[in-house]
């Protein structure tokens, strides 16, 4: 019963990390262009 919840939390964490990485890449490209 507890394993399913851990998997869901891991998936949410992975998605959050991916979104943060995407945002960081966007910030880096915008900074290089000088906005």
Swiss-Prot record:
Pfam families (UniProt xref): YhdX
InterPro entries: YhdX-like (IPR035384)
Name listed for the protein in its UniProt record: Uncharacterized protein YhdX
Organism listed in the record: Bacillus subtilis (strain 168)
Gene encoding the protein: yhdX
């Amino acid at each position: 019963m507890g394993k399913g919840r851990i998997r869901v939390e891991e998936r949410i964490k992975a998605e959050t990390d991916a979104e943060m990485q995407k945002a960081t890449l966007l910030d880096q490209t915008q900074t290089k262009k000088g906005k």
